[in-house]
Amino acid sequence: RQMCIRDRLKGKSQLEGNVILLLIMTITITSFFVEAGEEGVSSTYEPIGAWVADTIVPSTNLVVGASWAHMLAIATFLFLIPLSKHMHLVMAFPNVFFHDMRPMATMEPLQRGEDGKAVPLEDLDLESFGTANYTDLTWRHLIDGWACTSCARCQDVCPAYASGKALNPMEIIHDVRYYANDNYATLMAGEKPEEDIIARFGEDSIWACTTCHACVEACPIYIDHVPKLTDARRHLMMERMEFDEKVEDTVMPLMATIENLESDSNPYGLPSHERGDWAADLDVKVAEPAEYIYFAGCAASFDERNKKVARDTISIMKEAGLDVGILGMQEGCSGDAARRAGNEYLFQMLAETNLATFEEIGVKKIVASCPHCFHTLGKEYKDYGGEDIEVMHHSQLINHLQVEGKLPDPQHDGSVTYHDPCYLGRIGGELEAPRNAIGGVDVETERTGKSSFCCGAGGAQMWMEEHVDDGYDRVNVIRSKEIASTGADTVAVGCPFCSTMITDGLSAIGSEMEVKDIAEIVWEQIKANDAAI
């Protein structure tokens, strides 16, 4: 099988694996001859050794030869372990034991103070940003390099790899180990290698990641692939500010987005004073204390398609009798795109500004319809303050209100499938509330729940230009084909980016399937019930 059936590992070197398998086979076979040469070999406890003794009747020379071959094979195996992927036999346990216990996809601040919190921008004391050299990697990242089993599970689930891009998450982890091997003498001398680890990774790999964390979820020994790429982005974005020619077409649109975030606190570059215009006729509190603050996010504030989702969410909350408000023009971007793009300084500036607004208004409960805002506000802002603020996704609140009887029992028309957003399902751990909120799902996609396939917008990819080679589909098209194959009438989504990407993907393949947010489905049913009465 190792020699002939290699679809998953096509193109990978066979030599190392074959040598190891040969050694294991040698150790196993020679052990039977060693047993056969023992006095009084037991057929009960050593049946194969006893069978060899009775059948082959080994000579003394054969036993001695087998014993030497046995010991040499073991010695060779032990010698090769540190130089091969089989170092995982030693390093897998500490890798699992010391794995990051924080919520998945929670990125590390630029600098932590003695209290464990992020150091404020004005107090930062750093000589460099991000990862450019092997010596910039944390000890946990280094262990990952030696713990990898080369099983390729991460490769198999990576959306960038599936769409033919340069990124292979398994090779990124291999690069960490190979870099150490190649620069061993320099590192042991306590010096910094001249080789740039960013060049080893490849900028086309670094910028292809959607940060969906499917690779992390698939890894049996808790290797964390994504931070190595996002830390490299930090260095490229905050220190070098120059990019390889082969990624310029991909990254340049992102640079315009960063400028928009800096000037207008939204990626579209639209005037910030228009941020709350979508709710002008909804009779909702604006920048006033309320039990629930709906954090619309940039997409729902400025994108016409997603404004409807925001309006329906507010309508649902008011239908349930909740005290709800919005921040209006005082709301700023959560900073997710800036952080995933590598501009950590901008992210921290946006986070500190939003937290100051939350404190001024007295925000205690936030509802977000964007999983990226849900994750960033609820998980990552805690390093900067606001630990007592509860953040929930709108599907969680809707389902809670349905259970309490404040909203009608959930239902939907026609057959419905559901696409799990990465930052809500796999990363956020919320799989049931979205499904329950719409009255269940009639047919699931092939890859669903924590194994769901990315829509292609995460990791700031929404603001980059995706390029694929002939013979490959874009990430959103791959996912849209899976969704269309369910035969459902409607695909429910819980993310504005997923809505955009899947709508485009379905259009590209000529599918007429409808794409609806959870809030849209729920509000349609509420209006239908009211009309029936």
Would you name each region that the model predicts?
Residues 79-206:
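Ferredoxin-type iron-sulfur electron-transfer modules and their immediate structural context
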Residues 2, 136-145, 167-173, 180-331, ...:
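Iron-sulfur-cluster electron-transfer modules
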Residues 2, 6-125, 131:
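Membrane-embedded alpha-helical bundles of multi-pass integral membrane proteins
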Residues 158, 219, 502:
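Cysteine-centered loop/knuckle micro-motif
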